[in-house]
């Protein structure tokens, strides 16, 4: 399969490699995000030793590592070395004048099997490796572990890295490259269902319609995506049943702790613990109105992974019927009527990403420091209001609406947005209004935008 995206990360790795000096690079990110694919692309044409740690004991892993080491280095075997210290000293001798990429994937497994490995690495980096030509990559999927136990200040490895790369899911603009045969609308729809995880994106075939992909690649019980969320949770967690209940509760509309407790039927303290774990896995996030402190009581829980959100909304509650092969029934009755709502929510994220790109390309009248959604009380109308896009900086704020509908955006929508902006943010002098529309704008709105610098319009053709 063609290598897609990650050009910045690949360029950074190539730049570090070209120094011909010792490097220790930490690469981490949630499962399925493409860490191994990035590393595999990077090591093409380079001498490399790749070792993936497993949930095994340290001695068994050291034996496997030594076997791979002798084979990769084309060195005569002297058997399994008696310690990891000896292993890395051997590598240090081999790489004094030899550029080698050493990759230890799933490092948290090794660190949990051998409590001393981090201190061993600290010692060998300081006394043996730093004057070699070794290009050392430590890779892991347990994000919280990598941040605390590898990159954290209290880790023995603190200060030993020369670079770190946290791989994030693809934005829409990288994800769309998986579907070059789809038009922009279908590309957005696919992204709203699959999110930015490369492995999920690669399952869809843009030679087929979206409907056929949903049925064949998600709802069909033999497909990879049909059981992916369940399998991933089993791999990461000991009590997947309780986590299933929480994720399903959020996917079907519960956003506060009280609502999640009510829907999942789990005790409040258990829910809090499980939510913390899901946030560490980057599957759930706590969203707060943009500009408010993290401690804000108005925070809500939402599923961070778009595919998990889709799966727990439509697949998980309909498993019994899907096991019977009732794919068409579930699609037509349960999914098809709800897809516009799903696309509308996903479109907001795509608009945020587009607006950030506009900032990066210097196409906006002023910079902003944070972007997101805003919700809260309207003191004038005495009701709750939502703003799809709110981006503020020292020179003003952008206030936006993102419309995924078949009708053109008209002046009524514009007037409502301006009214909300004036009522909700009276202290902000410089307000620029932003409208995103799937179906374009009426001629009246276009005329206003031509004359008014405080209004910006974006259609799908601008993506």
Spans of features found by a protein language model:
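A cross-kingdom feature that marks ATP-driven nucleic-acid transaction machinery
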Residues: 299-463
């Amino acid at each position: 399969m063609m290598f897609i995206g990650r050009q910045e990360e690949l360029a950074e790795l190539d730049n570090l490699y070209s120094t011909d000096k010792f490097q220790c690079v930490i690469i981490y990110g949630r499962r399925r995000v493409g860490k191994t694919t990035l590393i595999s692309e990077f090591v093409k044409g380079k001498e490399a030793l790749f070792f993936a740690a497993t949930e095994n004991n340290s001695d068994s892993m050291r034996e496997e590592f030594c076997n791979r080491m002798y084979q990769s280095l084309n060195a005569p075997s002297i058997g399994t070395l008696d310690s990891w210290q000896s292993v890395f000293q051997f590598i240090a001798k081999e790489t004094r004048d030899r550029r080698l990429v050493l990759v230890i994937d799933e490092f948290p497994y090794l660190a949990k099997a051998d409590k001393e490995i981090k201190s061993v690495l600290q010692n060998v980096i300081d006394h043996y490796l730093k004057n070699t030509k070794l290009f050392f990559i430590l890779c892991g999927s347990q994000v919280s572990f990598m941040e605390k136990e590898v990159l954290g200040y209290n880790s023995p490895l603190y200060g030993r890295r020369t670079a770190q790369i946290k791989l994030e899911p693809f934005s829409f603009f990288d994800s769309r490259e998986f579907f070059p045969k789809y038009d922009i609308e279908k590309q957005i729809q696919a992204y709203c269902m699959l999110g930015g995880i490369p492995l999920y994106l690669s399952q869809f075939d843009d030679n087929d319609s979206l409907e056929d992909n949903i049925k064949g690649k998600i709802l069909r019980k033999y497909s990879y995506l049909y059981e992916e969320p369940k399998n991933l949770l089993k791999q990461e967690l000991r009590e997947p049943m309780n986590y299933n209940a929480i994720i399903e509760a959020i996917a079907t509309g519960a956003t506060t702790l009280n609502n999640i407790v009510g829907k999942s039927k789990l005790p409040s303290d258990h829910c809090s613990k499980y939510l913390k774990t899901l946030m560490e896995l980057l599957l759930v996030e706590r969203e707060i109105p943009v500009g408010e402190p993290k401690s804000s009581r108005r925070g809500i829980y939402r599923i961070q992974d778009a595919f998990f959100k889709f799966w727990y909304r439509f697949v998980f509650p309909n498993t019994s019927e899907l096991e019977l092969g009732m794919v068409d029934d579930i699609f037509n009755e349960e999914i098809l009527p709800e897809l516009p709502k799903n696309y509308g929510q996903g479109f907001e994220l795509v608009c945020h990403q587009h607006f950030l790109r506009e900032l990066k390309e210097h196409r906006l009248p002023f910079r902003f420091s944070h972007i997101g959604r805003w919700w809260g009380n309207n003191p004038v109308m005495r009701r709750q209001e939502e703003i799809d896009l709110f981006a503020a900086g020292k020179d003003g704020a952008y206030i936006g609406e993102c419309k995924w509908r078949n009708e053109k955006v008209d002046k009524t929508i514009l007037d409502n947005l301006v009214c909300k902006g004036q009522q909700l943010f009276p202290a902000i002098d410089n307000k620029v209004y932003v409208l995103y529309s799937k179906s374009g704008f009426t001629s009246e709105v276009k005329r206003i935008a031509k004359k008014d610098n405080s209004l910006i319009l974006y259609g799908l053709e601008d993506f």
